[in-house]
Amino acid sequence: MKQFYTLLLMVFVSIGCTTDKQLTSYVNPLLGTATLWEPEDLGYVRTWKNRTWGAEVFPGASLPNAMVQLSPVTQFRSGAGYQYEDTVIYGFAHTNKGHWNLLHLPMLPATGEISASDYASGYSHLNESARPGYYQVFLEKYGINAELTSTLRCGYHRYTFPKGVEKKLIADMTRTNNRVKDWNIQQEEEYVFTGFQDTDGKIYFYAVSNYPIKDIRQVKDDKHEISLVYFGESRKNEPLELKIGFSFVSVKNAKMNLDKEMIHKDFTQVAKEADKTWEELLSHIKVTGGTTREKGIFYSTLYRSFLWPALRSDVNGDFTDERGNVVNEGFRYYTNPSFWDDYRNKLVLLGMISPDVTTDIIKSITDKGEKRGGYMPTFFHGDHASVFVAGSWLRGITGFDLERAYKLLLKNATVPGQGGRPYLDEYLKRGWIAEKDTTHVPTWDEYKAAVTKTVEYAYDDYATALIAKELGDQENHDLLMRHSGNYKNLFDPSTGFFRGKIETGSWIADFDPYYPYFAYMYREANAWNSLFFAPHDPEGMIALYPDHKAVEQKLDSLFTEPWRGYEAHNMTGFIGNYCHGNQPSHSIPYTYYFIGKQEKAQCVLDSIMGRFYDMGEEKLAYAGMDDAGEMSAWYVLNAIGLYTYSPADPEYIVSVPLFDKVTFTLGDNTTFTILKEGNGKKIRQIRYDGDVINGWFVTHDQLKKGRELVITTAE
């Protein structure tokens, strides 16, 4: 009988092995954490003392668009706090984006004598692991195995100490990635400590330990100060566990979040639930074919696309608004998107899979705009909330007040003022923004990035015009559509580049299309990187050149003229002068489509996907910053053969997928399929639901019908 049961168990195991592999198992949260060092990857020989920017992503535990990102800190004042090549860990912080901010409440378990300025622990990547919703590392200095998992608003720490040692916890309350204005940590109950950190607003925490708290002391030396939590009964051998709730409202709400999400669950349960949440999200896109490497990059980049924006409201709906008031408006409140980056692709991908989150993000930015002078929030550069709102509405995400959002966006586009578009008065007066005339190499933010602003404002005006049309505002629609042609005002036909002008209207004389300006004429780009940006009007853009042959020659030169060895902030990963390590170039390859050379575009797209997402010695580096998921979403969409060439428009340019079959389930549970026929780079035919598509675009409404998109290729 025993042999029978053993045989039966083997059968069940065998059956289990034939089931589909979990998609979370393809995800490597460490992908993107390494930095590029070699000249062939960077595009130049490094001379700066500081390391170049990597993808600036974190490997720790989080849920999709959560409040908590619980992740190791290897260096403060770095992009995401974690760099793969670093050798020590300072703590595990609870918020993260990857933009040199956040990293709230870093904590580290410890034992023995502890120095306030020298407490970081060494670690080895051989004893480090990560998967969606879970992170583990062995802290060599203290002999402690650290494990982390999380819910939306709570972090769970499990620390396994050496047997018989005294357990302590370092809380580095004076550190985040920003300046800490104020902080507090105190014992609340026998097993509870609470507090806050104040950087650009307060984040509160409520922490529950499975060991009684004996004392909380401040330890300082001439360099630094830390808080040290001592635990009673701490020589017992059970792991030290901490369940920590967070809130941007109050300690009371942090406790409420903890009680709702985590307090009655153990570590294994929380980690399993996190894995399940990610599995459900990743399962929206299932792929067949491709290599194991391609699937690994695909699901890792899909995972990475859903970590930002971050939740800022509590389980009861409370949040702290732009005026510092605690309010409850009946929606989940989120941080602003990283608009200069992710409007291009990631925010569309977010809406395709999580339209409910998109709806609440738009409600959030509208609430902020109404309370900050009547302007819709912008981010860093450009005014791309217009693209996000228009593209979301036209794709059927209509659960927000479009008129309220439009009122803000129209003010952004037409009324100069603090909080609106920089240099809008110039743009409205002339149709372009003037730049200073100089013969000196400019640096950083002394200049206007006038070319980039002008061409981007033109596209933003187009997006706002689409909303005006939806609302029947014909007068402003016509005005904004006229403004959408302003990109032409800075096109220099004598050079074939967008080029800066001075106040008089003359072209800037000292013009070098190869030089990578940081903020002079172009934003983090040179003239080559800035070519062909008119996603709303590619035919009009192309018509600025003498003929299609001239456009083809310009494109060919872009991808073959070698980068001239300049060291530039945020510019790495080159094909000729095309830079994939930063966003401005990301739509350029598709220009080939509009001159009848789609196959040339595909050669470039395949090269980008093949080269720039697992670079470096460890195969863990991106070509450049992920910028809150934009770089990742670029890969996801191109890998399935649908790209958001003009994200304001509800359509996708079709390319050759990496995979033979893609099954995509939208957020409304409609499923469409993408099939690739042949292995060539030239698209011979595109069919949807059996009908041939004339042109290169498939609409969102077509995809919502849940049919087959068949892409037939030829060599």
What residues fall within each predicted segment?
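Bacterial Sec-dependent N-terminal signal peptides
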Residues: M1-K21
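Hydrophobic, small-residue-rich alpha-helical packing segments that form membrane-like cores
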Residues: E456-D460
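Accessory carbohydrate-recognition regions in carbohydrate-active enzymes
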Residues: T19-L347, G351-V387, L394-V455, A468-N489, ...
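Surface-exposed interfaces of beta-sheet-rich extracellular modules
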Residues: K676-G690
